[in-house]
């Protein structure tokens, strides 16, 4: 009897195949294919195919394929942990950027030696080519099989809650499934609750490394047990893993926490508390330069500057919805203004006051403070507003995740007719300013509606999303979709910037809001006299000053361009007798607001130069006998190159020019390119100034 056939579409091409086929047979000739996208859903290669299916191949080196490989590596790690620690109870194990983690409940924390042992067990499991096999199970079967895994039982019983968290890697809204690891004889050697998909077998995991272990609360809540989390990375090839490790070594050298201490920029005193930074004079100089330029650009782009208090009555956040949606991220209330008589009876009711977590409610009150006309729109409000968010102590990280942060916060109110032009101008403004700070490699991410969680009409969501997409496409930048990733109140574009070593940072966000104008009953008078709701746009260009400071510090590895550098010019006299001449020049720079220092210590000249070089200052200004006799100074740059005998007036003009142009200068060549041709009789070259 002839084998029955089915009609399917494979990578866009119609095919007739045997009814019993799976992706394994369909793609048997291409070992780089490790999974399929079946009717739009990622599935294992072993998934049976049916008539009418649309099948797309997924290769190991694709984003989807790499994610599947990393999740399979998570299972291999969990299996290895339970071999090494049989009493370990399983939490969850999602994929994260570059790798994965898994949470375990164990008696003793994992040590570096434990990680080495676990890696060896993983290597053995990988070499044994264990096959991943999926089984659909009922809730009763899952509870029975996971009887010794209390955290898995919790996920099974609370499926709906689990779907809203990283536990969704284990739980599907459709069905429950187990994944068995089978040895070459087909025996089950390990199992885990998981929605999948997974690799055909473990040998597809070519390059991995366990990085570290850390404590983590179950489901991220301090009310839950403390678990041990193991982090790992995995890549399709060993070369990619090696390249990643090289990048991480460079990232460690650029760590803003390390550089901040070495360069005396900021600190986190224990007396103040976690996530609350203090900026030292040099760090504050950088902050001031960042803010000054931002203010200048906002003035040029017709923003109105506002200022709002740090605390407010809780009723404002009831109106905005923050107390409903965001209370866990807010500091506890302060009950104030209550008055009692001598008997303790309340004679005047008090109010709960909160530290503000966001500036937008107060900006809405400014908009609402009087009647608005369409002639006033677009109205662009801007503030460097400090906000306070209660981040768990285990989450705070240097300046990138803090509890007190200052946002360069803007809220734009416009008509629907103005929305496209406003968004276009806003994106161009954001990109221009980011480029001036030295970030030039961008892509955009468009977060669209979650069909199950949104406010506002489908019509306005569609209009706003299409408008954002048009604006993004007109920018010429790569646009990456984030389906369902928008907040409930509106779609968003985020600007993702790559730094000097290729890492991606989310910097600016442009967020439409259909919620707050309704909650605050914001209105303007339209040309026909009717009352209309404005379109509201949230925009944070830096995100926060603190986080953007950290990004720039790591991007430049502390070697800021002169306009941002905490010390822009450092004077080093060759000998004491030349100090007065040098001091006169440095004072003239300071009169023009150049940030200067002079090393008048007792150190020998060579040591002063070495110390100056370590400080990453853009311009080391040297004065020796020839400089003094010719009323000149010499420059030494970060790369060790030197420019000698520059007349003081020309030297000052060049320094001011490079600061004004906001260019990076690390060498003589950079300096020449920034300032044009040097004056007559001035030579560019390298001089030996390290001699004692």
Curated annotation (Swiss-Prot):
GO terms for cellular component: cytoplasm. One of its GO terms (biological process) is threonyl-tRNA aminoacylation. Its EC number is 6.1.1.3. It catalyses: tRNA(Thr) + L-threonine + ATP = L-threonyl-tRNA(Thr) + AMP + diphosphate + H(+). It is found in: Cytoplasm. The keyword Nucleotide-binding applies. InterPro entries: aa-tRNA-synt_IIb, aa-tRNA-synth_II, aa-tRNA-synth_II/BPL/LPL, Anticodon-bd, Anticodon-bd_dom_sf, TGS, Thr-tRNA-ligase_IIa, Thr/Ala-tRNA-synth_IIc_edit. Pfam families: HGTP_anticodon, tRNA-synt_2b, tRNA_SAD. Keywords: Aminoacyl-tRNA synthetase, ATP-binding, Cytoplasm, Ligase, Metal-binding, Nucleotide-binding, Protein biosynthesis, RNA-binding, tRNA-binding, Zinc. CDD domains: TGS_ThrRS, ThrRS_anticodon, ThrRS_core. Its cofactor is Zn(2+). SMART domains: tRNA_SAD. Residues 255-561 are annotated as: Catalytic. Zn(2+) binds at residues 360, 411, 538. GO terms for molecular function: ATP binding; metal ion binding; threonine-tRNA ligase activity; tRNA binding. HAMAP family: Thr_tRNA_synth. Homodimer. Belongs to the class-II aminoacyl-tRNA synthetase family. Catalyzes the attachment of threonine to tRNA(Thr) in a two-step reaction: L-threonine is first activated by ATP to form Thr-AMP and then transferred to the acceptor end of tRNA(Thr). Also edits incorrectly charged L-seryl-tRNA(Thr). This is Threonine--tRNA ligase.
């Amino acid at each position: 009897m002839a084998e029955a056939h089915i009609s399917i579409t494979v990578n866009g091409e119609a095919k007739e195949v045997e009814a019993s086929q799976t992706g394994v047979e369909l793609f048997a000739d291409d070992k780089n294919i490790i999974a399929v996208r079946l009717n739009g859903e990622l599935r294992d290669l072993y998934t049976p195919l049916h008539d009418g299916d649309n099948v797309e191949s997924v290769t190991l080196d694709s984003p989807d394929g790499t994610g599947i490989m990393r999740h399979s590596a998570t299972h291999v790690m969990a299996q290895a942990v339970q071999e090494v620690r049989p009493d370990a109870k399983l939490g969850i194990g999602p994929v994260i950027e570059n790798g994965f983690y898994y949470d375990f409940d164990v008696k003793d924390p994992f040590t570096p030696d434990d990680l080495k042992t676990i890696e060896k067990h993983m290597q053995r499991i990988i070499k044994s080519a264990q096959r991943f096999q999926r089984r659909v199970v009922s809730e009763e079967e899952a509870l029975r099989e996971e009887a010794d895994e209390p955290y898995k039982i919790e996920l099974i019983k609370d499926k709906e809650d689990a779907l809203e968290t990283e536990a969704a890697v284990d739980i599907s809204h459709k069905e429950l499934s187990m994944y068995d690891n089978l040895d070459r004889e087909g025996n089950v050697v390990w199992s885990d609750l998981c929605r999948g998909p997974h690799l055909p077998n473990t040998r597809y995991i070519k390059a991995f490394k366990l990085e570290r272990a850390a404590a983590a609360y179950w489901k991220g809540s301090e009310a839950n047990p403390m678990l041990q989390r193991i982090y790992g990375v995995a890549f399709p090839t060993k070369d990619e893993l090696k390249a990643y490790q090289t990048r991480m070594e460079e990232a460690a050298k650029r760590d803003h926490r390390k550089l901040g201490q070495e360069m005396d920029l900021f600190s986190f005193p224990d007396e103040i508390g976690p996530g609350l930074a203090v900026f030292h004079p040099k760090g504050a100089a950088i902050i001031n330069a960042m803010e000054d330029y931002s203010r200048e650009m906002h003035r040029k782009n017709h923003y109105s500057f506002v200022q709002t208090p740090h605390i407010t009555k809780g009723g404002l956040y009831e109106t905005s919805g923050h107390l409903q949606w965001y209370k866990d991220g807010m500091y506890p209330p302060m009950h104030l203004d209550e008055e009692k008589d001598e008997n303790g009876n309340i004679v005047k009711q008090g109010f709960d006051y909160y530290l503000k977590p966001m500036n937008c409610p107060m900006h809405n009150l400014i908009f609402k403070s009087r009647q608005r006309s369409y002639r006033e729109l677009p109205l662009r409000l801007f503030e460097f507003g400090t906000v306070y968010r209660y981040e768990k102590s285990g989450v705070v990280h240097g300046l990138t995740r803090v509890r007190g942060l200052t946002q360069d916060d803007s809220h734009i109110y416009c008509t629907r007719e103005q929305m496209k032009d406003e968004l276009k101008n806003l994106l161009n403004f954001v990109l221009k300013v980011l480029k001036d700070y030295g970030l030039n490699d961008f892509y955009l991410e468009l977060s669209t509606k979650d069909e199950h969680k949104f406010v506002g009409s489908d019509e306005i969501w569609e209009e706003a999303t299409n408008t954002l997409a048009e604006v993004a496409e007109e920018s010429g930048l790569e646009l990456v979709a984030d389906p369902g990733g928008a907040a409930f109140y509106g779609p968003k574009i985020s600007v993702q910037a790559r730094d000097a070593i290729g890492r991606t940072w989310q910097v600016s966000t442009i967020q439409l809001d259909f919620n707050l104008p309704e909650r605050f009953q914001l209105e303007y008078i339209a040309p026909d006299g009717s009352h209309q709701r404005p379109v509201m746009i949230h925009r944070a260009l830096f995100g926060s000053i603190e986080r953007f400071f950290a990004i720039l510090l790591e991007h430049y590895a502390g070697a800021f361009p002169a306009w941002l550098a905490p010390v822009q010019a450092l004077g080093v006299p060759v000998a004491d007798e030349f100090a007065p001449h040098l001091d006169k020049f440095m004072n003239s720079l300071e009169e023009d607001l150049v940030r200067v220092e002079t090393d008048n210590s007792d150190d020998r000249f060579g040591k002063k130069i070495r110390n100056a070089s370590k400080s990453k200052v853009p311009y080391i200004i040297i004065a020796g006998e020839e400089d003094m006799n010719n009323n000149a100074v010499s420059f030494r740059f970060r790369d060790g190159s030197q420019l000698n005998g520059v007349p003081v007036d020309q030297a000052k003009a060049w320094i001011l020019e490079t600061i004004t142009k906001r260019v990076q200068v690390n060498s003589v060549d950079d300096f020449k390119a920034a300032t044009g041709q040097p004056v007559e009789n001035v030579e560019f070259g390298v001089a030996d100034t390290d001699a004692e």
